[in-house]
């Protein structure tokens, strides 16, 4: 194999490794975004249930590390919703559901963009693999 061909092969191998790492990173981001979508979905469903409940609601609230506490929710007229940058605002249940639905839609768009990025990376990987596979032996 000539020195130029060896250098080309090393460059292609390096590009391939970098693209694989990029794909792993995008997959991790995709997983986190999908978890956020699931969180929004759970919150929306919970708020819809709370809206339809009457009187005090007995529930268990997670404290973390598998610990729960019994609690009574007496008032569901105001929901505190994070709006970003460490800021939270009070909203009605309907407004909170609207906010979470919008957030979920925005996250869905992020998923689409990340999937597009993964597709592009996959195409570039396939192109490199094809180029390496089509090289005549030296």
Swiss-Prot record:
Keyword Manganese: no
InterPro entries named in the record: PFD_alpha_archaea, Prefoldin, Prefoldin_subunit_alpha
Keyword Transmembrane assigned: no
GO annotations of cellular component type: cytoplasm; prefoldin complex
UniProt subcellular location: Cytoplasm
Coiled-coil regions listed in the entry: none
Pfam family, one: Prefoldin
Keywords: Chaperone, Cytoplasm
Signal peptide: none
GO molecular function annotation: unfolded protein binding
Biological processes annotated in GO: protein folding
Primary location class: cytoplasm
Subunit note: Heterohexamer of two alpha and four beta subunits.
Purpose: Molecular chaperone capable of stabilizing a range of proteins. Seems to fulfill an ATP-independent, HSP70-like function in archaeal de novo protein folding.
Family stated for the protein in its record: Belongs to the prefoldin subunit alpha family.
Name listed for the protein in its UniProt record: Prefoldin subunit alpha
């Amino acid at each position: 194999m000539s020195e130029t061909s060896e250098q080309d092969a090393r460059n292609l191998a390096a590009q391939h490794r970098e693209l694989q790492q990029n794909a792993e990173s995008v997959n991790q981001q995709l997983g986190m975004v999908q978890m956020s979508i699931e969180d929004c979905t759970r919150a929306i469903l919970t708020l819809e249930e709370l809206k339809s409940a009457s009187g005090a609601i007995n529930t268990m609230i997670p404290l973390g590390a598998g610990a729960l506490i019994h609690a009574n929710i007496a008032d569901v007229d105001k929901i505190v919703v994070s709006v970003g940058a460490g800021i939270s605002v009070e909203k009605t249940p309907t407004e909170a559901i609207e906010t979470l639905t919008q957030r979920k839609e925005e996250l869905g768009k992020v998923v689409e963009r990340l999937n597009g990025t993964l597709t592009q990376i996959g195409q570039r990987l396939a192109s490199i693999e094809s180029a390496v596979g089509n090289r005549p032996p030296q």
